[in-house]
Each structure stands twice: as structure tokens, then as C-alpha cells.
């Protein structure tokens, strides 16, 4: 098994020594890149684009040609699993995801398909294999999925929402039905992530984008318990190498200790949590990822550099930190501001030199 030329990201996730803080950016492959917008012109339909392995691979690689990032993330969408289950998914250009047959009853849940993941989502695994080959062991490749709760939000609401009131109401009105839906999603998510690892993903991440909408009690019952189940059943070693698992719950700072105890290797933070305080709260249980406010990337390089350094100082010395945004990059972000961010993180965080590929031996 060939080792990665740059395993800084994985070492930080496992809280092993690194020469500097690794950096990557959520949604680093996307609309802020002019070359991505040009690529999308070939296949305007978003899901059709995701289902074309060669295009998904190219989108994955594009940000690494511009910026010296420490990881690639496969280009895809969290709604691939609901799509494979038979919901009528449409991505509207100005609206976002729309599900024309929302899941709102026991009958709706029972009608959902439970496909063989490696067949139904083979396009994603083909894209991973292409990306692994193209990366040629330069940096790790991240695979990902949406959390069961977040996927269920879209499936029950029928579209994106700031509140997901329909989904939240169902938790009170039909809790057993909702648990059945979540268990189906959990079963498929485990198979999905394991198939991504089999195809070549070095790290996997779960995006619990809407977990922060829940009460503390409901968060544990309807989100965290299912995340813990995934952590227990996802492959964590392959060919003698550890496969780190990252959990990201937006607005989940109040439950940081519980998330840290859920079985993941690293916890993603949004920008509303102080990373220094977060480090003190979790101790040496998990690594932390984050957590620059994406809005600052719409300002200027000087402000961006200052804010990035503030986060690095707040975290302090030692490993266990992966620099990232607190959520996905905004499509209107200027390219030069992304470059300024990456440069600031790299220049400030350089530590005592040591071999960065010593983990994969």
C-alpha cells in the first residue's frame, strides 16, 4: 500500500504531531470557481452532473490546482441516498432541492426503496476511484454523507427550509414513523460510507446540517443516537491504516461533549463556538475542525488573515486542529480571498519540522 505524500490532514484528525495546521474548505469544489461554472455548462442538471463520474472527478480536483490544500473532498451531494430510495428529487436553480413526493406517513416510509448501495450509487464510487488515481497519493480524499436527521428533514419537508417545521412537527406527531425512516437512512448511510472507503476514500465525514434545530432531548434521540450507530459500524481501518471519521453538526456547540463521546475522531465546529473553549471542553478525546465564519471571505485579505490567525491562536499549540470554515464557502467568494486564507493558515501555523508522511509506513 503506497503511503500519502501529504498525510498532515489525517495526522491532525488522529491528534498526531504535524508540522503545521492542515487546511481544507467545505464546498471547496463549487460555484466560486470560474472553472467549475464552465464545467457545469456541459451538464446544467445538477444531479446528472453528480452522476457523471468524470465530471465529478474533475470538480473534485479543481480547487487543488489553485490552492495548496491538504485534502480533497469528492464532489457529490448529500441527497444521493434519498434519490436512490425513490423520492422524486429535483434541484431547482434558484430554490435548491425539491422533493415532489415528500415522506409524511408510515405508508410513505414503507414505500421507500432499500437499494443495494454499491449498485444504485455506483457513479459515486466510480468518481472516487477516478479521483484517487488522479490524486496519485498527493493528499487524502474525503468521502461524505448527510446525517440521517438532515436527510429526513429534506425528505419530509419536501424542500429546503430555515426551520423545517414539518419535519420537527413529525417528531412529536409520529415519532415511531420518524424513527423508522431514520433507521432506514442509517442502514443505507453505513453501507454508503463503507463503499466509499472501499473505493478509496481516506477519511469520511457526516454533515448534520440541521441538527442544531432540535431541542437537546430531541437531538440525542433523533440525530446523535443514529450518528453513534454509524460510528460503531463504519469501517475504521483499511489495509492497516486508520480511517478517521468527522462529525459536523451546525449550531451543535451546546452538545460538543456529547458529540465528542459519540465515537467520531473529530468534531467540526461552526463559527458560533470559540475553538479555544471547545478544545478545553473536549480535552484529548477528539480533534477539532473549523471554524472561520464564511462571511469574512467576502471582505478583504487583511481581515481574513487576521481572523484566521485569531482562530489558530485560540486553539493554541499542539496537534488536533484542522483549519476549515464554519460552514460551506459562499459562491460569491473572490478567488484571491481564498488564496489569502490558505496562505495565512500555512504561514502562521508552521511548527517544528518533522516528516509529514510518517503515518503511512
UniProtKB/Swiss-Prot annotation:
Residues the entry annotates as binding substrate: 27-31, 77, 154, 209, 327
> What Gene3D superfamilies is this protein classified in?
3.20.20.210
Keywords assigned: Cytoplasm, Decarboxylase, Lyase, Porphyrin biosynthesis
Q: Name its cellular compartments.
A: Cytoplasm
EC number annotated for this UniProt entry: 4.1.1.37
| Cross-referenced InterPro entries | UROD/MetE-like_sf, Uroporphyrinogen_deCO2ase_HemE, Uroporphyrinogen_deCOase
Please indicate which superkingdom the organism of origin belongs to. Bacteria
User: What catalytic activity does the UniProt entry give for this protein?
Assistant: uroporphyrinogen III + 4 H(+) = coproporphyrinogen III + 4 CO2
Q: List, alphabetically, the GO terms of the cellular component aspect.
A: cytosol
Which Gene Ontology biological process is one annotated for this entry? protoporphyrinogen IX biosynthetic process from glutamate
Q: Where is this site: Transition state stabilizer?
A: 77
Matches recorded under HAMAP family: URO_D (MF_00218)
Subunit structure, as described in the record = Homodimer.
Similarity section: Belongs to the uroporphyrinogen decarboxylase family.
Q: What is this protein called?
A: Uroporphyrinogen decarboxylase
Organism, by scientific name, is Coxiella burnetii (strain CbuK_Q154) (Coxiella burnetii (strain Q154))
